[in-house]
């Protein structure tokens, strides 16, 4: 019985070490991938030296950064945006524009990788705001750290250009959540904001 418990404990320690080693390799790969922007990511890590939870959050973001990018803006992208902005509210796009841009795919544009351009300041602001929302909103408080990292911490959701969306959304919708809704149901809160 004692040997079985010891074997289980030893196995758990080995698995934990292997996972930690894998995460370290991912972090090193991401820092190397950043090339000339590596200093920004190192500044971020240095910033949270004395806050272990935020440091782990920063490492999570950096480890996942080689897969995050947006597309180069300007030129064709601006033309498509202009057409979509003007015609989308009316429900139809003029046939002239449809013929010209109907086949267009922005995925042919050059990718701009976050690791190459993102700043420590942007990430620090994002991490601090995410932690504030984790504690401030009742529906976020029950999230584990792993769920927080997966669902609340990320600074982007797709391939959109980098922007300071947390501040914008907090200014636009925060007062509704602060003054009208006091519950803990995230779906109900989202419904309130979308009205």
Q: Which residues does each PLM region occupy?
A:
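Secondary-structure boundary elements
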Residues: 56-195
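Bacterial Sec-dependent N-terminal signal peptides
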Residues: 1-25
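Short, flexible coil/linker segments at or flanking structured domains
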Residues: 5, 29-32, 111
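Serine/threonine-rich low-complexity intrinsically disordered regions
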Residues: 5, 19-23, 51, 94, ...
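Mixed-charge, low-complexity segments
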Residues: 17-82
